[in-house]
Amino acid sequence: MTSTKQHKKVILVGDGAVGSSYAFALVNQGIAQELGIIEIPQLHEKAVGDALDLSHALAFTSPKKIYAAQYSDCADADLVVITAGAPQKPGETRLDLVGKNLAINKSIVTQVVESGFKGIFLVAANPVDVLTYSTWKFSGFPKERVIGSGTSLDSARFRQALAEKLDVDARSVHAYIMGEHGDSEFAVWSHANIAGVNLEEFLKDTQNVQEAELIELFEGVRDAAYTIINKKGATYYGIAVALARITKAILDDENAVLPLSVFQEGQYGVENVFIGQPAVVGAHGIVRPVNIPLNDAETQKMQASAKELQAIIDEAWKNPEFQEASKN
């Protein structure tokens, strides 16, 4: 894959609610020239139907080849996006999904790599930080070419919540959620700003917002998935658009800074896990992490979040099957 290639090809693995919403976002936004959709054999006809349905929108958007794909179609793809996995049920945490989804992930990654794929993996199935790690292990790919959606959606939720609280456009809010995409994530309050004005200073000039309100706002962001799952069964629109944004950054070689699940090599005192932090991303994957200078409390939260993920990974990798399949 090179940044000068004009025909951009994406393979989507998993045509459930998230996958099909992502495909729809790609069509709406005119991203990529080719989209192949892979499903398990018993759901292949659904992928055929979705490809046909999506193709009927092309006269209103831009040309794109859309079809139900096989793993062999991954060989010349620029990007393989993995959304396939067991869904999160009411009452389940993302980490509860580990056992079911690691086995699914191993099967997918093995078949993609066997096709001769040389592009970039983008992982969205949950628990995303753990499955990004397993994709790296099972693929043998360089860490830069394995990316998780990380806290991209959480950060978008955070910005939207702050925007509503402050009555400003969310696009003018610059604030990140870091750590696990899940219960141990945290808000980087120390660097939240509105158009360059530190949040604390901005609040002084606008209105009297109590600390308790900000804590409640963050908790609403952290628990948003549970709220949505309890009301409609699943979340898919927000993450689909987040994935489309990451896809555009990769295919257009933007060198955009986005909060992603990124491999840690000592930043924040954390190593050997993929976890949510801002990073520069372009045509060759992760260019470099952007290491926000966290305060002491935030650094401790980052380390605690990573420790939880590491414990899950260590337990999972006691499975000899996963050990044998590891290439990194």
UniProtKB/Swiss-Prot annotation:
Primary location: cytoplasm
Pathway noted in the entry: Fermentation; pyruvate fermentation to lactate; (S)-lactate from pyruvate: step 1/1
Active-site positions on this chain: H181 (proton acceptor)
Purpose: Catalyzes the conversion of lactate to pyruvate. Plays a role in redox balance maintenance. May play a role in enhancing virulence in mice. May be considered a potential virulence factor.
GO molecular function terms listed in the Swiss-Prot or TrEMBL record: L-lactate dehydrogenase activity
Recorded GO CC terms: cytoplasm
Keyword tRNA processing attached: no
KO phenotype (gene knockout): No change in total NAD(H) pool, but a 57.4% increase in the NAD+/NADH ratio. Reduces the ATP pool by 54.5%, and extends lag phase during growth. Significantly reduces maximal heat flow. In competition with the wild-type strain, reduces nasopharyngeal colonization in mice. Reduces production of the pore-forming toxin pneumolysin. Increases susceptibility to various antibiotics, with widely varying mechanisms of action, including erythromycin, gentamicin, chloramphenicol, rifampicin, penicillin and vancomycin.
Regulation: Allosterically activated by fructose 1,6-bisphosphate (FBP).
Assembly with partners or alone: Homotetramer.
Catalytic activity: (S)-lactate + NAD(+) = pyruvate + NADH + H(+)
HAMAP family hit by this protein: Lactate_dehydrog
Family per similarity comment: Belongs to the LDH/MDH superfamily. LDH family.
EC number(s) from the headed UniProt entry: 1.1.1.27
Keywords: Allosteric enzyme, Cytoplasm, NAD, Oxidoreductase, Phosphoprotein, Virulence
Subcellular location: Cytoplasm
Amino-acid positions noted as binding substrate in the UniProt annotation, renumbered to this chain: Q88, R94, N126, P127, V128, D129, D154, S155, A156, R157, T235
EC top class named in words: oxidoreductase
Phosphotyrosine PTM positions: Y226
Record-linked CDD domains: HicDH_like
Residue sites binding NAD(+) per the record: V18, E39, K46, Y71, G85, A86, S107, A124, A125, N126, S149
Binding sites annotated in the UniProt record for beta-D-fructose 1,6-bisphosphate: R159, H174
A Gene Ontology biological process term: glycolytic process
Originating species: Streptococcus pneumoniae serotype 4 (strain ATCC BAA-334 / TIGR4)
Entry superkingdom: Bacteria
Full protein name: L-lactate dehydrogenase
